[in-house]
């Protein structure tokens, strides 16, 4: 029988439509949750990030089921099964949803191309969902999930580590106080891909791991034979399964400027990509693979938080912006070694931070540099 807290979840979800966030202190009353008031959670995708997230949930809720297409796979699946020996284990998430009648919510930490179909299936059964970033594989799926969430009145959240970190809060404070004046340009970059990307997939005869259900791993994608070029981890570099460096890291890096400046849809977007050259002057076009590097320029109108049009430039594949005059030459851009970061450039100075908005710094001419230390990127709201 559903307890009071679970009923409250259902009622709170009816307040608004679409994807939104209900803070933990709301779900838990005054922050005191009795054992009988725990939610029954299942993890779909028990390795990698799924393993990490399950540990976070288990500190407050009850993990009653685990699901993974590779039951003895690496990247934490075995660890999850040992940590939660009383949780029922499934290979097919559909079987799990059919069997586990007492479920309240699921976490989804699977390859990008399966997020939409799994989340829609769960929400259509009245389950609340926590979906790892990126929310979906494409825009159409995101719109579909928004409609399904509203129809079924469920609580939803996308996992975006760093989304409510102290770094974001501090940058918001600096922006609101207009310490660097009107912001007119943003640079954001990552050292990703750190997986093979920009190449044609090789035709290799490989033996599928014995306990991997490859058909379930493929899910809605076209049937193809097993290859280690996809599983584990490397699926990120192929359009049929992942979203490349931008889709993998953009939400962690672009979140701070989007949130603090109140950005919405861009007015226009321009993209250029770099590719790998097979030999001298012979360019390698890879239609199914994400680019080896890219530069994406987005233009935004002024917002209520920033009275200036903004040009945002995203870079990946090892590309990054030139060193601004406002930042000392011996200082890193963004994070240590300048591997990932954000520069928000205004009339009076520059704000710099790393991925997850870690370690924000404020540089202003004639003033001492302000540095704010953070290490709380696991804040996900």
Q: Which residues are covered by each model-predicted region?
A:
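A structural signal for well-ordered alpha-helical segments within the folded catalytic domains
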Residues: 116, 120, 143, 165-169, ...
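N-terminal glycine-/serine-/threonine-rich beta1-alpha1-beta2 phosphate-ribose binding loop
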Residues: 1-131, 140-155
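A contiguous active-site-proximal alpha/beta segment in oxidoreductase catalytic domains
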Residues: 128, 136-211, 216
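Glycine-rich, aromatic-lined ligand/substrate-binding cores of catalytic
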Residues: 210-381
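The substrate-binding groove and active-site-proximal loops of carbohydrate-active enzymes
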Residues: 132, 159, 243-246
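Short, solvent-exposed loop/turn elements at domain surfaces
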Residues: 49-53, 74-76, 99, 195-197, ...
């Amino acid at each position: 029988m559903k307890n009071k807290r679970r009923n409250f979840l259902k009622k709170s979800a009816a307040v608004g439509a679409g994807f939104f966030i209900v803070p933990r202190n709301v779900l838990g009353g005054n922050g005191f949750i009795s054992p009988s008031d725990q939610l029954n959670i299942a993890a779909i995708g028990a390795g990698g990030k799924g393993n990490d997230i399950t540990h976070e949930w288990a500190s407050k809720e009850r993990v009653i089921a685990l699901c993974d297409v590779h039951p003895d796979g690496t990247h934490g699946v075995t660890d999850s099964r040992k940590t939660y020996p009383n949780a029922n284990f499934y290979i097919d998430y559909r079987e799990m949803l059919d069997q586990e009648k007492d479920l309240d919510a699921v976490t989804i930490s699977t390859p990008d191309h399966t997020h939409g179909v799994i989340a829609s299936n769960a929400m259509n059964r009245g389950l609340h969902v926590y979906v790892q970033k990126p929310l979906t594989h494409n825009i159409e799926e995101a719109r579909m999930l928004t409609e399904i969430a509203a129809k079924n009145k469920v609580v939803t959240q996308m996992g975006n580590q760093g989304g409510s970190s102290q770094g974001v809060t501090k940058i918001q404070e600096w922006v609101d106080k207009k310490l660097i004046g009107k912001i007119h340009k943003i640079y954001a970059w990552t050292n990703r891909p750190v997986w093979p990307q920009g190449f044609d997939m090789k035709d290799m005869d490989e033996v599928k791991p014995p306990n991997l259900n490859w058909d379930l791993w493929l899910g809605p994608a076209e049937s193809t034979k097993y290859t280690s070029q996809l599983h584990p981890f490397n699926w990120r570099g192929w359009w049929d399964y992942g979203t490349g460096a931008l889709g993998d890291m953009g939400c962690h890096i672009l979140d701070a400027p989007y949130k603090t400046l109140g950005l919405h849809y861009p007015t226009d977007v321009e993209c250029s990509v770099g590719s790998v050259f097979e030999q001298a002057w012979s360019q390698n076009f890879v239609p199914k693979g994400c680019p080896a590097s890219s530069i994406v320029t987005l233009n935004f109108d002024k917002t209520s938080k920033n009275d200036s049009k903004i040009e945002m430039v995203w870079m990946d594949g090892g590309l990054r912006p030139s060193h601004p005059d406002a930042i000392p030459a011996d200082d890193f851009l963004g994070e240590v070694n300048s591997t990932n970061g954000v520069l928000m450039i205004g009339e009076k100075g520059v704000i710099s931070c790393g991925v997850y908005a870690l370690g924000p710094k404020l540089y202003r001419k004639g003033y001492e540099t302000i540095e704010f230390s953070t290490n709380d990127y696991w804040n996900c709201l």
